[in-house]
A protein has these predicted regions:
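Bacterial Sec-dependent N-terminal signal peptides
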Residues: 1-24
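Alpha/beta-hydrolase superfamily serine-hydrolase fold, recognizing
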Residues: 20-254
């Protein structure tokens, strides 16, 4: 318990660092010197959407606690893992974490729950290959911004959950993507940067009601016509007293 709390505090401190400049004076970007493993396929297929990158600190330690990073794209993109690392991953590496930045299938590739299935497959892959990449999976945090924050929150609130039902609609949250379905997909801490928590409240925004909205693309229809599915995409619907430690960051204009 104490180790998990300490890791979350370290994660929060690293988040504060994200607000600091990441370049040297004059716009010169400091060269990367830390160990990196690029384009690892966590699903055992050929999809770009199923690749991840691992970044380790340059301290030479034997193992590092892990933070998974998910980019934001309104669920439209399937290949922005590099942007996820540059946006919020680099300060975490500087703070001593191993950062795993992942791709996932877009709403154009497949409808929900494919995206959370991919996230969980990536977590299982990391556990299965912890020794190969110097990872200490006794702590796995997850963070992301916008739609990546949404998927991070969803990963956290669905620890120990295989399927979930709302009304007459059931979704397979865990999924069976990849070769490591015997491994756990649980996470120990979540930091959500302005990702939707209750998708139903987004109905107040006129653009969300549109059948062409990002939310509609994610679930395969207008949100107003699919209330059960909208609820199933909402992290709020899964909250119990047993969820891991959470930090959700929103602004007044989100």
């Amino acid at each position: 318990m104490k180790k998990a709390i300490l890791s979350l505090l370290m994660l929060c401190c690293a988040i504060v660092m994200m607000a600091q400049p990441q370049s040297a004076p004059g716009g010169f970007k400091m060269p990367e010197t830390n160990p990196q493993y690029k384009d690892l396929n966590y699903a055992g297929d050929s999809l770009e959407a199923h690749r991840l990158d691992i970044y380790l600190p340059a301290t030479g330690h034997e193992k590092y606690k892990v933070v998974m990073v998910i980019y934001g794209s309104a669920w439209f993109a399937n290949n922005m893992k590099a942007m996820g690392y540059l946006s919020i991953g680099k300060p975490l590496v500087d703070a001593g974490f191993a950062v795993v930045s992942i791709n996932h299938r877009s709403s154009g590739d497949a409808k929900f729950p494919a995206q959370i299935n991919d996230v969980k497959a990536a977590i299982r892959y990391i556990r299965a290959h912890a020794e190969d990449y110097h990872l200490d999976t006794s702590f796995i945090g997850i963070t992301g911004y916008s739609s990546g924050g949404h998927l991070s929150s969803l990963a956290g609130v669905t620890n120990h959950m295989k399927t979930h039902t709302v009304g007459k609609t059931t979704v397979d949250i865990e999924g069976n993507v990849g070769h490591y379905t015997d491994y756990s997909s649980e996470v120990d801490a979540v930091v959500d940067w302005f990702g939707p928590i209750d998708m139903a409240t987004m109905e107040r925004c006129e653009t969300v009601k549109d059948a062409k909205s990002p939310e509609a693309a994610l679930i395969g229809g207008a949100p107003a016509d699919m209330p059960d599915m909208i609820s199933l995409t909402s992290p709020y619907s899964y909250v119990t007293p047993n969820i891991p430690r959470f930090l959700v960051i929103h602004g007044n204009s989100d």
